[in-house]
A protein has these predicted regions:
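Active-site capping/gating regions of soluble enzymes
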Residues: 35-186
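Helix-rich catalytic cores of soluble enzyme domains
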Residues: 1-53
Length: 186
């Protein structure tokens, strides 16, 4: 399954580049289940090894891709979760082993994390500093959940929803700089 998906991602990336489009390469290891952070590390590492092998085999210019992976994190059913600092350290350690320095940027999936978890984990990674890639976010739920809840489909809630969305975007922007702090949350 990993090989087939990696092959498909590489073909997609090559076709994008042939058409002057920057491919978003998204090899996601799901956080569903009771796996430990160490198991996620192993599977993420193996997945990325296969993906980059296929990208190279297909002649993809790694300087012209955007990598959109998961963070190395405990499964959703694990009750004693790893700290954000541990998640950051494990994620960066894993990526330093397998993600070539030619890759200019990594934009993380939130993968089901809460808004605060995703922001704090990204912030902790950027606080490590001196990384060969720019680390940012490509969150769905972890960027939009508060805004959607505030809006609730009602026109009269649009301003409140917009403020909630802008706040989350600002918090994640600060996290990309390693300058987020829990005290900034409302």
């Amino acid at each position: 399954c990993i090989n087939a998906n990696a092959h498909a991602l590489a073909r997609y990336a090559a076709l994008c580049q042939e058409n002057e489009i920057v491919p978003i390469v998204e090899p996601e290891v799901l956080m569903d289940g009771a796996h430990t952070i160490d198991r996620c590390y192993e599977v993420t590492k193996r997945t990325l090894e296969v993906v980059f092998s296929e990208l190279v085999a297909h002649g993809v210019n790694l300087k012209g891709i955007c990598l959109k992976p998961n963070m190395v994190i405990d499964g959703t059913l694990v009750t004693d979760k790893s700290s954000p600092k541990t998640i950051a350290e494990k994620t960066i350690s894993c990526f330093k082993e397998v993600v070539p320095e030619d890759v200019p940027g990594i934009v993380f999936l939130s993968g089901g994390q809460s808004e605060i978890e995703a922001t704090e984990n990204l912030d902790q990674m950027n606080k490590i500093g001196n990384l060969p890639w720019n680390l940012s976010f490509s969150y769905g739920r972890a960027l939009q959940a508060s805004a959607l809840q505030a809006w609730s489909g009602k026109v009269e809630n649009e301003e409140t929803a917009s403020m909630a969305f802008n706040h989350r975007a600002e918090m994640n922007s600060l996290a990309t700089l390693g300058k987020w702090d829990a005290g900034l949350e409302k």
